Amino acid sequence: MSRATPASDSYTNSNLFSSTYLDEHVDSIDAWDCDEEAKRVFEELRALWRAEGDLVRSHNEDELLSAWIDEVCEALGFDSLSETTLPGGYGYNDHLLFDSPERRREAVREKRAGREEGAYGLASALLEAKQWDADFTERFADDRSYRDASHQVKYYLERTPDDLGWGILTGGRTW
């Protein structure tokens, strides 16, 4: 299957990767050839949006997690584990995301054995959810070890094993 080379105006480069890499090399990566899977997932997400779209703004954080965010993560191929204590007992995050049910089950075993660090080390990402359209930079009113939602995810990642390199902050619309 031939692959189209992306045009620089089809994306916003935040300089995580060079434009040359994105324009000339990324399309040669086998994993990048995922158009059919992407279309299938997009249609699944579109159907979910048709079912939930008029409700999401009224959901509190837990409802949004259950009715929207969890469903989006599942459609994207993630399995999840809820409210896992950070290693060292520095709080807990909303979800750990795993690339397979087997890795999630292995993480549950680690968690039950009191090895939170092992559970976090098996995760693909941690996820912190807020209400729909939450301002991630708005200062929290109460005294916490982190000042806002963006800093909260950074704080969590700093207290997890190096194997876990990704944190996702979402209010359902912005990820």
Tell where the protein language model's regions lie, with residue ranges:
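A short, conserved, highly charged catalytic patch centered on acidic carboxylates
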Residues: M1-W166
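Hydrophobic or amphipathic alpha-helical targeting/insertion segments
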Residues: D163-W175
